[in-house]
């Protein structure tokens, strides 16, 4: 391999394999990257032996630096690899490629006092922390200079407006693309919009109103001494009566800096918000979930309309907690109410997942078919009678006596004796009214049957009743005798005269008073 194998040795190879290609990435440098860099140096007329020392790597960086801004991806990768090798020769601790480029940059600035030899993508920016190298205002050699916006940024802004048509996404998109811009750059972005001139006119009117308010709140002080920077007016902030140099001086002066770029951005954001309300007239109260709409689509529409609402965050929070559940369809609302108080959005989406989709439709269809094909329910009383039916002929359950195949049982079905039927069975239970002639047994107050061999506690029969019955029989007999015809009576008297006594007892009864009174008289 020649010089390639002597570029890094021992601990330097181990340190190389710990450096990441990108910040936070998983891939790390390997020896194959050194071999590739050595092969690429030949394309630029540079010797591979330059990679073996720190000074040689610095010469390579000096040659490649002017070509990096307009170079290809291979050229940029070669420059990054050489920076990493330079840090390894200088025994600098680095974690990734970006860290190596920053260390090389600081070293060259300390040696030469200028950053002109470094690529524009790695030069430090003047604004505070968090601002990258693409900012329009950059600090080069201690001086602030303006770099125009790239065509890519302007194209992204125009494409955003054309696709979203002043939707709720336009405001945050403008904030991201205009970060750190001067009023001059912001006016360039607005002038690139060809369509939607009505919205542009609304933004211009808002800018004029805000500029007038600025002039009222910040009156002009007295006459300024010669050479002193004047204070910005409303038209200066809008970029119509000020130059780019004045705007940069107002933004980055040491005493009392005025961020004219951020102020102008805030005015335009107010105008964009009015355009969003004009192009999206849908009210958040009118956003309701359809009967067959998935809950996730409804939530997306809800938050899109909520994003366009320019209200207080507390009001938006109340809308989220109240209207999101209130405007859902009945199926989702029933599920959401079962989640308790103040459920999270993740819990709502998980609980309502599948509602309104094909899966739920299939389940509802299956339940409907199941109910339609199910047999008619049997009333409880009828079911009880069917379960407790019993045959009185054989005593078995499951059929009636009419359907019984056993021989017909004779006599009473209750006691088994002949001469009566079950309705007149003397052994049946007596109710409160006793066993009457009616065919139904009383159901109230059942009385237990008295066992045989026990003497009942009822009093004996009254003898006066027997005596009265006897008197009644005698009275009937005497009445029958009185009603005998006269011929029979004369025949009896004739027989007496002839000495015959065929009816002696009857004659004596007629001749004595016994016919009227009993023997006790």
From Swiss-Prot:
Task: Extract the InterPro entries matched here.
Answer: Gag_p24_C, Lentvrl_matrix_N, Matrix_HIV/RSV_N, Primate_lentivir_Gag_pol-like, Retrov_capsid_C, Retrov_capsid_N, Retrovr_matrix, Znf_CCHC
Question: Where is the stretch described as PPIA/CYPA-binding loop?
Answer: 219-226
Domains: entry comment: Late-budding domains (L domains) are short sequence motifs essential for viral particle budding. They recruit proteins of the host ESCRT machinery (Endosomal Sorting Complex Required for Transport) or ESCRT-associated proteins. p6-gag contains one L domains: a PTAP/PSAP motif, which interacts with the UEV domain of TSG101.
PTM per UniProt? Gag-Pol polyprotein: Specific enzymatic cleavages by the viral protease yield mature proteins.
Instruction: Report the GO terms under cellular component.
Output: host cell nucleus; host cell plasma membrane; host multivesicular body; membrane; viral nucleocapsid; virion membrane
Kindly list the ranges of residues that form CCHC-type zinc fingers according to the record: 389-406, 410-427
* Annotated region (Interaction with membrane phosphatidylinositol 4,5-bisphosphate and RNA), positions in chain: 14-33
Q: What is the recorded name of this protein?
A: Gag polyprotein
């Amino acid at each position: 391999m020649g010089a390639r194998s002597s570029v890094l040795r021992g601990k330097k190879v181990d340190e190389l394999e710990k450096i990441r290609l990108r910040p936070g990435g998983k891939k790390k440098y390997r020896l194959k990257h050194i071999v590739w860099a050595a092969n690429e140096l030949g394309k630029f007329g540079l010797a591979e032996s330059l990679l073996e020392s720190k000074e040689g790597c610095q010469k390579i960086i000096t040659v490649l630096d002017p070509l990096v801004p307009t170079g290809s991806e291979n050229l940029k990768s070669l420059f990054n690899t050489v920076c990493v090798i330079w840090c390894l020769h200088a025994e600098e601790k680095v974690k990734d490629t970006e860290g190596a480029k920053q260390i090389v940059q600081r070293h060259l600035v300390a040696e030469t006092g200028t950053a002109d030899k470094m690529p524009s993508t790695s030069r430090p920016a003047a604004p505070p922390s968090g601002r990258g190298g693409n900012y329009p205002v950059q600090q080069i050699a201690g001086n602030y200079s303006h770099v125009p916006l790239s065509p890519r940024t302007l194209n992204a802004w125009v494409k955003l407006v054309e696709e979203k048509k002043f939707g709720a996404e336009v405001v945050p998109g403008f904030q991201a693309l205009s970060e750190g811009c001067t009023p001059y750059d912001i006016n360039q972005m607005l002038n690139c919009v060809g369509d939607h001139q009505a919205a542009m006119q609304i933004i211009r009117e808002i800018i004029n109103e805000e500029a007038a308010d600025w002039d009222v709140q910040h009156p002009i002080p007295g006459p300024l001494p010669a050479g002193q920077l004047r204070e910005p007016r409303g038209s200066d902030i809008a970029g119509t009566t000020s130059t780019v140099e004045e705007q940069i001086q107002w933004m980055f002066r040491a005493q009392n800096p005025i961020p004219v770029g951020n102020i102008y951005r805030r005015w335009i954001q107010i105008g964009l918000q009015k355009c969003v309300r004009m192009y999206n007239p849908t009210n958040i109260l009118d956003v309701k979930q359809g009967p067959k709409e998935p809950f996730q689509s409804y939530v997306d529409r809800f938050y899109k309309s909520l994003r366009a609402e320019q209200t207080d965050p507390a009001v938006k929070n109340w809308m989220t907690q109240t209207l999101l559940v209130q405007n859902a369809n009945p199926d989702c609302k029933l599920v959401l109410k079962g989640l308790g108080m103040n459920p999270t959005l993740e819990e709502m989406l998980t609980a309502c997942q599948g509602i309104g989709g094909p899966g739920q439709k299939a389940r509802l269809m299956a339940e409907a078919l199941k109910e339609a094909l199910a047999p008619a329910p049997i009333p409880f009383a009828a079911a009880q009678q069917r379960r407790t039916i019993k045959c009185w002929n054989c005593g078995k359950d499951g059929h009636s006596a009419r359907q019984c195949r056993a021989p017909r049982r004779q006599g009473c079905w209750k006691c088994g004796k002949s001469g009566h039927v079950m309705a007149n069975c003397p052994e049946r239970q007596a109710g409160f009214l006793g066993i009457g002639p009616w065919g139904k047994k009383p159901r109230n107050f059942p009385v237990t049957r008295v066992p045989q061999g026990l003497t009942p506690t009822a009093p004996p029969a009254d003898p006066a009743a027997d005596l009265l019955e006897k008197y009644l029989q005698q009275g009937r007999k005497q009445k029958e005798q009185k009603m005998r015809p006269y011929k029979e009576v004369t025949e009896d008297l004739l027989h007496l005269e002839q000495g015959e006594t065929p009816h002696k007892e009857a004659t004596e009864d007629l001749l004595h008073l016994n016919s009227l009174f009993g023997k006790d008289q």
